[in-house]
Amino acid sequence: MKELAIIGTTASGKTALALKLASEFNGVILSLDSLCVYKFIDIASAKPSADELALVPHFGVNLLMPDEHFDVGMFFDVYKTAREFAQKNGKNLFITGGSGFYLKALLSGLTPKFERVESGLSNAQIYELVSSLDPEFAAKFSANDTYRLQKWFDIYSFLRSSGRDEAVSAYLRENTLAPVASNLAIFELSWDRDELRARIKERTRAMFEQGLLDEARELFARYPQRPKPLNSVGLKECGGFLRGEIKTQTELEELICTHTAQLAKRQRTFNRSQFESKFSGSVKGCEGKIIEFLKG
């Protein structure tokens, strides 16, 4: 079994390439998309069609209702299930989608982040507090380790303000995710900015032809509380249109294109800064490198 990730911005062609290669090279696909996990969000998420989902085994698709919670820890479980299935059945695992944060967490793990709290205490005073309340944590660093002392105090303050009396070390043990993926080959589809904008415009128009507004209308009627997935690019703007905040469909399409391009820019920046060891190239270039990797 070989594992690889195909990343890139929205509208870069990740899904199509993953489907093509997974069908040719005995693969399964793990969706790296925070919207595809939800049922009923089909057009807005550019989810593979029913025929495409039937062509290749998929994981991470249609798991939850739009008002249900999904987080990176749950994604880890889906990844483990997909990997075990691929290993058991002698298949290759293709990971693809636009949620680069999930991929980064698979490779590097995840530690909770907390707001900095000014203690007004010296290192020695904090260390004395740590030693008395959390000797397990204190045993791992010196009294001069300013960074870890501050980190401990930040978490300690968070727990106390939440009415919890558990030790910081116990909290971290339960809430820190260790890396679960290694030796993962990463391929990034890259496009010229103007070409990508044209693709975004074309895809947005196609989504409207497929019934994006009808999908949005049904979702907002079913979930008037507007859960987080309904605030994603595409659905959020459609909601504004349906409420009369956006006056014309032309304006709506232009707004979705603009916000999608902004999302693509953020995705591109994240992928470039977080994944140093990867191959970046055109769709054709990446396809050739992936085939070379799979045959190697």
Summary of predicted features, one role per range:
Residues 1-296:
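Phosphate/pyrophosphate-binding catalytic cores of soluble transferases and nucleic-acid-acting enzymes
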